[in-house]
From Swiss-Prot:
Recorded name of the encoding gene: proS
Family according to the record: Belongs to the class-II aminoacyl-tRNA synthetase family. ProS type 2 subfamily.
UniProt keywords, alphabetically: Aminoacyl-tRNA synthetase, ATP-binding, Cytoplasm, Ligase, Nucleotide-binding, Protein biosynthesis
Record localization: Cytoplasm
Name recorded for this polypeptide: Proline--tRNA ligase
Annotated organism of origin: Brucella abortus (strain 2308)
Length: 442
């Protein structure tokens, strides 16, 4: 993409309404625009990042055996009355009527609808286990939306729902999603720590929030430093191997980790002082087993191997891709702007033509652009006629992993300068060497 043809509305000043780093940088870098309280448009560069996050989520959900569907945003109130949640949910749910005066709602979540889909088609235990997921926009009428897309009223969610014959099957479904989430967050460039969460009236120990450590986090969290050294499960993880999954979950739940709500001072005291980490955290995912909470009132049953009907045991697993984008910025930025992990960066590299109109600079820039494009690097070529300082500021702000600087002096010497955004390291390379280095990373 050429910057001269790209819609990138950069803000030079810090927006007054932005309270946290991610909100400020997303507005300044032209990723989002606020349309009303807690509701945002995603602009081209922001949408590219959001789509890359969703791609990684899809790949890992599919790897774990989940099936993607797409449920509507508008739901019937009748389904929610059937589960008993319509009147109990509260003012966060946006309730509407169609022209026939039928009561509808803008879905804040999808347990009822996915249970209705399941009960309409699945009759036998032989069709289990089953995990259905979708990525869809949701709306919750927050009293005080704040922090940009971190706590907005409209947001994108990946919701997965598992259906199993019994608790043991549901536990393994939970373990599959647990491991899938570890891999997902690592691929997005985040070090997420699973922390035991409240299971409410259902009880048990199958509820975890995935937390990343960040100074601007809303929650106080406590964990053993051992988590920071645990190896994330690799791409060769066998999601059909129950023993392997159980071993991974055991390793990732044995050290102490808890949010403020679940913090136990007695257990915390057992952690060596030098291993204690007390910090702020941001929730980026939540997985939860809720048994027959929805299958019972909605009659979601299957015939078991004993010939009798059994209520299915269910779980839900949520990641907010839009929130995840903001979390990645909170975890990786500096005073100059965003520092994107390579996996979700909007472009693979930025080419800075220091002197558009100069035959040598234009020629080298075009050569780099063509080579990187053909190699799948997806470069952004800054071909705009602006002063060098503005070009560098824009590249640092939008956070592309690598910058290739093409200037008259370097071109005369047959070289370009390559800058690593994260480390700030610069090196002068021959044009062919620069192309080889960047295409090797594609």
């Amino acid at each position: 993409m050429r910057l001269s043809r790209y819609f990138l509305p950069i803000l030079k000043e810090n927006p007054k309404e932005a309270e946290i780093v991610s909100h400020r940088l997303m507005l300044r870098s032209g990723m989002i625009r606020q349309q009303s309280a807690g509701i945002y448009s995603w602009l081209p560069i922001g949408l590219k990042v959001l789509n890359k996050v969703c791609t990684i989520i899809r790949e890992e959900q599919n790897r774990a055996g989940a099936n993607e569907i797409l449920m509507p945003t508008i739901q019937s109130a009748d389904l929610w009355r059937e589960s008993g949640r319509y009147d109990a949910y509260g003012k966060e749910m946006l309730r509407i009527q169609d022209r026939q005066k039928r009561e509808m709602l803008f879905g804040p979540t999808n347990e009822e609808m996915v249970t209705d889909i399941f009960r309409s088609y699945v009759r036998s235990y032989k069709d289990l286990p089953l995990n259905l997921y979708h990525i869809q926009w949701k709306f919750r009428d927050e009293v005080r939306p704040r922090f940009g897309v971190m706590r907005s009223r409209e947001f994108l969610m990946k919701d997965a729902y598992s259906f199993d014959l019994d608790y043991e099957g549901a536990k393994m479904a939970y373990y599959r999603m647990f491991v899938s989430y570890l891999r997902t967050f690592a691929r997005v460039g985040l070090q997420a720590i699973p922390m035991r969460a409240d299971t409410g009236p259902i009880g048990g120990d199958l509820s975890h929030e995935f937390i990343i450590l960040a100074e601007t986090g809303e929650s106080q969290v406590y964990c053993d430093r051992a988590y920071l050294d645990l190896a994330v499960p690799g791409a060769d993880t066998d999601f059909r191997n129950d023993a392997q999954l159980t071993d991974i979950v055991t390793r990732w739940t044995t050290p102490y980790a808890a949010t403020d709500e679940m913090h136990d001072e007695a257990d915390w005291a057992k952690v060596k002082p030098e291993s204690q980490v007390s910090a702020r955290g941001i929730e980026v995912g939540h997985i939860f087993h809720f048994g027959t909470k929805y299958s019972e009132p909605m009659g979601a049953k299957v015939q078991g191997p004993d010939g009798k009907e059994h209520l299915v045991s269910m779980g839900s697993y949520g990641i907010g891709p839009s929130r995840l984008v903001a979390a990645a910025i909170e975890a990786s930025h500096d005073d100059a702007g965003i520092i994107w992990p390579k996996t979700i960066a909007p472009f693979g590299a930025g080419i800075v033509n220091m002197k558009p109109g100069d035959e040598g600079c234009d020629g080298v820039s075009e050569k780099l652009y063509e080579a990187l494009t053909n190699a799948g690097v997806d470069p952004l070529l800054d071909d705009k006629d602006e002063r060098p300082g503005a070009k560098f500021a824009t590249m640092d702000l939008i956070g592309l992993p690598t910058q290739v600087i093409v200037g008259p002096r370097g071109v005369a010497a047959g070289e370009v300068e390559v800058k690593d955004r994260k480390t700030g390291e610069r090196q002068s390379l021959g044009i062919k060497a620069a192309i080889n280095m960047l295409t090797a990373q594609a």
